[in-house]
C-alpha cells in the first residue's frame, strides 16, 4: 500500500514537471525567431532569474552586454525581456521607435500599493488616453504653479536658505547631509502638491522621510522580480505586506495627508496646489467613467510626483556634495565662479546659469557619474519592432540601460571617472552631450526635468556660496561607489560644512 502511494506521488510529480515544462516551451516558442536578440540560456520555469545579480543590476547587465552585444534578451520566469544598451540602440528604441515602445508592462507588486486600471498614476501608467490625460495635467499644473518661472525660483531659493541655516547649525562638525537634503527638496515638491511647507523638526515629516528612505530597494530586488514574474505568489495571505512594509507605510502616510488636505479644500477658491487642481478635475469628471480623474488615482499621482520629484533630486545633491569633498580642486573652481558671477551676498538666480559654464558642467557631470537611475523604468512594445537588426515581438518588456549610455566608452573620454570637462569645449564653454540622458528620452522622459534642473542649480550654488565642504579630520576618504537600489545612493558618508 505504501509503495502504491509512493508510486502515485512520484507519477504526479513527474506529470506536473512535464506539464510545466511543456507550458514553458509553448510560452517561449514565439520568441524562437532567427532575429530575436541572443541571451543566456534560460532555465525551465525560472528563466534567467538566478543568473541576474539584482543586488548590482548595472554590473550584471554590463557583463551580459560584453558577451551578447548591445541588444540582448533575458527571460524572467515566463516574462520575455530585452535589454537595450549603448547610445545608438537606446536612442533608436526611445526616440526613433518611441510610439511603439512607450507602453509599460504590468507591475503586479504595485497592485498592492493602490495601482489599478483606473488609478495608474503617471510614471507606470499604460501608454494611452489615461496616461496622456495625467501627463498633460501634471505638466500644465506644475507650470501654473511656477515651474520654469520666477515665482517657483523664489520658493526654491528660500528653501535653500532654510537648508543653509540647518547646515550652519552643525557648526562644522561631521554629519551625513542626506537627511537635510531630503527635507529641503521634499518641501519644494510638498509646496507644489499641497501648498504646505514642513518644519524640519516636524515629527510626521521626519517619520515620512525615514519610511521613504528605508523603502529604497523594496521594489527592485530579487524578491520583487520574482513576485512580478510569478504574480500568483502575491495571493499568499500577508506576503505583500511583509515584502513591502516600508512602501506600504509610505503610501498610507501620503493617503493620510490627502484626507486631511481634502477637508480644507474649498472649490470656490483658487487652487492652492496640484492636489486642489486635481480635486477640481474630479468634480468635472463626474459622469465620465472613462476619465482618469478620481480619488484613487489622485493618491497614485501624488505618490508618483512625490517620489520622482524628491528622491532623485536629493540623491543627486548628495552625490554632488560627496564629489566636492573628494575633488576639492573642483569645489574651489566652482566657488571662484560663484564669487565672480554672483558674489557672496546676492542669492543665486537661474539667470546666472548661462554665465557659469563650469558650475553647469559640474552639475551635469555629477548626474552622469552618480548615475542614480541606471536601469530605466521598463517599457513594453505595443507592436513588433526592429532594433539594431533584431526583431522584438509585441508585448516584450524593454529595459533601456541608461547606465550604458552615461558610461558609454565610445562617447565619454573618462567614462568611469568624475571629469567635468566632459561638458566643456576647448574654450571652456558649456556643451551638452547627446549621450547625457539621466532623465531618459522620448515620450516617457521624466516630466519633472525642468523642476529638477532648477533645484539642482539653485541648491548647489547656494550651498557652495555659503560653505566649504571637506572630509572630516581623521576619517578615511569616502568611497565614490554607489549602493544599488532605486535610486543608486552614495555609500554613506559624513562631511564638514564650514561657513566661508
UniProtKB/Swiss-Prot annotation:
Record carries keyword Ribonucleoprotein: no
Biological process, per Gene Ontology: arachidonate metabolic process; xenobiotic metabolic process
Enzyme class (EC, first level): oxidoreductase
Tree of life domain: Eukaryota
One Gene Ontology molecular-function label: iron ion binding
Localization: Endoplasmic reticulum membrane; Microsome membrane
Protein's membrane topology: Peripheral membrane protein
EC numbers: 1.14.14.-
Amino-acid positions noted as binding heme in the UniProt annotation, renumbered to this chain: 446
GO cellular component: endoplasmic reticulum membrane
Presence of the UniProt keyword Oxidoreductase in the record: yes
Keywords: Endoplasmic reticulum, Heme, Iron, Membrane, Metal-binding, Microsome, Monooxygenase, Oxidoreductase
Names of required cofactors: heme
Major subcellular location class: endoplasmic reticulum
UniProt-listed CDD domains: CYP2D
Family stated for the protein in its record: Belongs to the cytochrome P450 family.
PANTHER family: CYTOCHROME P450 2D26, CYTOCHROME P450 508A4-RELATED
Protein name in UniProt: Cytochrome P450 2D20
Recorded name of the encoding gene: CYP2D20
Amino acid at each position: 500500500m505504501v509503495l502504491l502511494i509512493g508510486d502515485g506521488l512520484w507519477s504526479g510529480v513527474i506529470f506536473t514537471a512535464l506539464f510545466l515544462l511543456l507550458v514553458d516551451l509553448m510560452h517561449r516558442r514565439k520568441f524562437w525567431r532567427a532575429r530575436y536578440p541572443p541571451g543566456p540560456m534560460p532555465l525551465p520555469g525560472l528563466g534567467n532569474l538566478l543568473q541576474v545579480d539584482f543586488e548590482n543590476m548595472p554590473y550584471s547587465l554590463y557583463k551580459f552586454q560584453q558577451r551578447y552585444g548591445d541588444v540582448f534578451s533575458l527571460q524572467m520566469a515566463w516574462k520575455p525581456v530585452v535589454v537595450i544598451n549603448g547610445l545608438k540602440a537606446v536612442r533608436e528604441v526611445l526616440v526613433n521607435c518611441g510610439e511603439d515602445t512607450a507602453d509599460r508592462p504590468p507591475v503586479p507588486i504595485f497592485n498592492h500599493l493602490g495601482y489599478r486600471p483606473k488609478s495608474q498614476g503617471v510614471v507606470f501608467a499604460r501608454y494611452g488616453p489615461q496616461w496622456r490625460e495625467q501627463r498633460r495635467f501634471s505638466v500644465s499644473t506644475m507650470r501654473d504653479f511656477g515651474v520654469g518661472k520666477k515665482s517657483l525660483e523664489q520658493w526654491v531659493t528660500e528653501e535653500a536658505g532654510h537648508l543653509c541655516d540647518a547646515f550652519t547649525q552643525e557648526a562644522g562638525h561631521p554629519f551625513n547631509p542626506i537627511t537635510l537634503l531630503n527635507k529641503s527638496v521634499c518641501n519644494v515638491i510638498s509646496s507644489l502638491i499641497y501648498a504646505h511647507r514642513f518644519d524640519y523638526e516636524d515629527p510626521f515629516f521626519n517619520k515620512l522621510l525615514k519610511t521613504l528612505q528605508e523603502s529604497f530597494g523594496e521594489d527592485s530586488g530579487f524578491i520583487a522580480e520574482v513576485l512580478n514574474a510569478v504574480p500568483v505568489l502575491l495571493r499568499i495571505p500577508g506576503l505583500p505586506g511583509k515584502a513591502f512594509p516600508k512602501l506600504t507605510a509610505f503610501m498610507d502616510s501620503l493617503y493620510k495627508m490627502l484626507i486631511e488636505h481634502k477637508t480644507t479644500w474649498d472649490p470656490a477658491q483658487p487652487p492652492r496646489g496640484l492636489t486642489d487642481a486635481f480635486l477640481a478635475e474630479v468634480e468635472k469628471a463626474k459622469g465620465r467613467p472613462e476619465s482618469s480623474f478620481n480619488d484613487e488615482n489622485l493618491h497614485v499621482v501624488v505618490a508618483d510626483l512625490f517620489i520622482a520629484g524628491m528622491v532623485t533630486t536629493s540623491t543627486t545633491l548628495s552625490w554632488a556634495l560627496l564629489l566636492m569633498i573628494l575633488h576639492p580642486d573642483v569645489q574651489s573652481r566652482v566657488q571662484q565662479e560663484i564669487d565672480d558671477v554672483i558674489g557672496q551676498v546676492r542669492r543665486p538666480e537661474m539667470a546666472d546659469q548661462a554665465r557659469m559654464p563650469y558650475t553647469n558642467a559640474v552639475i551635469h557631470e555629477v548626474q552622469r557619474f552618480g548615475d542614480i537611475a541606471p536601469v530605466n523604468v521598463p517599457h513594453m512594445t505595443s507592436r513588433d519592432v526592429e532594433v539594431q537588426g533584431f526583431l522584438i515581438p509585441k508585448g516584450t518588456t524593454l529595459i533601456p540601460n541608461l547606465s550604458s549610455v552615461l558610461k558609454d566608452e565610445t562617447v565619454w573620454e573618462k567614462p568611469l571617472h568624475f571629469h567635468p570637462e566632459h561638458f566643456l569645449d576647448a574654450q571652456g564653454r558649456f556643451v551638452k552631450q547627446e549621450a547625457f540622458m539621466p532623465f531618459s528620452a522620448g515620450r516617457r522622459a521624466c516630466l519633472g526635468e525642468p523642476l529638477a534642473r532648477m533645484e539642482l542649480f539653485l541648491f548647489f550654488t547656494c550651498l557652495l556660496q555659503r560653505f566649504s565642504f571637506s572630509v572630516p579630520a581623521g576619517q578615511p576618504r569616502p568611497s565614490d561607489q554607489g549602493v544599488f537600489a532605486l535610486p543608486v545612493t552614495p555609500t554613506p558618508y559624513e562631511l564638514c560644512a564650514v561657513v566661508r
